[in-house]
């Protein structure tokens, strides 16, 4: 599937406004898809359609730094030292899944890791589902919990 086809398929489930910070959306609108990694988008589509198969929410009216973060986002701009994350690289999102706890969603993904097109990282012991496709040096697991 091409990048364009992946984005078209994802639009059934997500608006780009949900996947990027408000600053990015205000500046770039629908063109903000350009800042999201193709590997991340392909992985998100598989997780949403084939693994979770339920509504997933990233940015909402109350939570707006859960997807792509730019240099103006408080989580980034308040840092006093070097800050690099999959979120600022367009390779991560923090999600709430309708009908599942974060732990249940993580377990579903782990059980279906063979469906994932790329290795992923998931944050453990948090109340949200963090998914990213940031490559890890010397990590061979398809799903790496950190």
Language model: regions and residue ranges:
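Active-site acidic/histidine clusters and adjacent loop/turn architecture
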Residues: 1-57
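Extended, low-complexity, intrinsically disordered C-terminal regulatory tails
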Residues: 41-80
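A short linear-motif detector with a strong N-terminal bias
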Residues: 35-37, 69-76, 108-112
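Catalytic cores and adjacent binding grooves of peptidoglycan-active enzymes
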Residues: 83-146
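Compositionally biased, intrinsically disordered/low-complexity regions enriched for serine, proline
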Residues: 19, 52, 71, 114-116
């Amino acid at each position: 599937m091409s990048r364009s086809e992946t984005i078209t398929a994802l639009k059934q489930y997500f608006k780009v406004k949900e996947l990027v910070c408000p600053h990015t959306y205000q500046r770039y609108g629908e063109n903000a898809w350009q800042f999201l990694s193709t590997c991340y988008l392909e992985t998100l589509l598989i997780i949403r359609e084939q693994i979770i198969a339920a509504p997933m929410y990233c940015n909402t009216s109350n939570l707006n730094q859960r997807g792509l973060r730019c240099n103006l986002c408080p989580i980034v701009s308040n840092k006093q030292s070097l800050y690099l994350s999959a979120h600022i690289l367009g390779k991560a999102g923090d999600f709430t899944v309708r009908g599942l706890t974060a732990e249940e969603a993580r377990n579903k993904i782990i059980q279906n890791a063979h469906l994932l097109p790329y290795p992923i990282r998931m944050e453990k012991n948090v109340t949200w589902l963090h998914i990213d496709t940031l490559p890890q040096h010397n990590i061979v697991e398809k799903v790496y919990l950190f």
